[in-house]
Amino acid sequence: MKEASILIIHQGALGDVVATFPALLRLKKLYGSMAIICQSNIGQLARELDIVDNWFPLEAAAFATLYSGQIDPIVKDILRSYRKIILFSRSHLLEKTIYSISEHDIYRIQPRPDLGQKIHVTQHILSNLVRHRLLEKSNKDTGIPLSLSIHGDRRSPQYDPLKIMIHPGSGSRKKCWPISNFVKVASSIKANGKKVEFIFGPAEYDLCDILLNSKRVSAKVHRLDKLKELAKMLKTAGGFIGNDSGVSHLAAFIGLPTVAVFGPSDPKTWQPMGRAVTVVRPDLECSPCFETGTVGCEEIECFGRIFPEDVLAAICGLVG
């Protein structure tokens, strides 16, 4: 197998991987070809967005052998064919296993900052790449954070400025603003002369049913299970509203004016990064509590302090 430049290994979900995209684009520009081992759906997305040149399915049985005593020869060939391997993982054991296979440079970076470390996840990734001398802190003279310097508008030239996409789901229901509030926002947006379309993933079809049964708003509804199809759809929109979710991170990265509704999670770490992002979040002493596992409110009080008018004002402030 021909030797290539950089292999990324990331076991995380959509939001975690999208948070690395600004860094991966910098690496690709500097080193050339790049591949990633990750979930298939995310790998297809990364290829669709031209973040990587190739991807390998993390869920394939061959890669499961990395955690066994007998590693699949195909996996060995893949790992040995890249000059640099960047492993986003907390696992020292996995790092040790990869070291036993490849003679090339291997760098392990924690995929998220430690609890209590007040740094954005994208800045955390970039800072560690600088620490490993894989990137230079090239923007120190301008004062522009590394994580902000590569964002642009990746939408289709024919995008519809009147179309607002709404994704009311998240990886955890504890991070979801009530769907009834999203419906109220959608109704107000339509009353202002814009179009609204809702997006639901496979784990959110129950929310989709609630929306369809409510009959309180007339809007297109999309049930999507392929992230690359989601990306194509987002590229056609004029704005986006969502929770603290991987889809919100993706929308912001693509360049949509994005409103992200935050409750118990911390926007200092997880705010979507893009050219036009507004976070709506109440100022409560108990927040953020999601990362520490101390969420104790039955109704999650922080979401109760966010009103449809707040979110409507935020999206209108971005798209008019």
Describe the predicted segments one by one.
Residues 1-320:
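Catalytic machinery of carbohydrate-active enzymes
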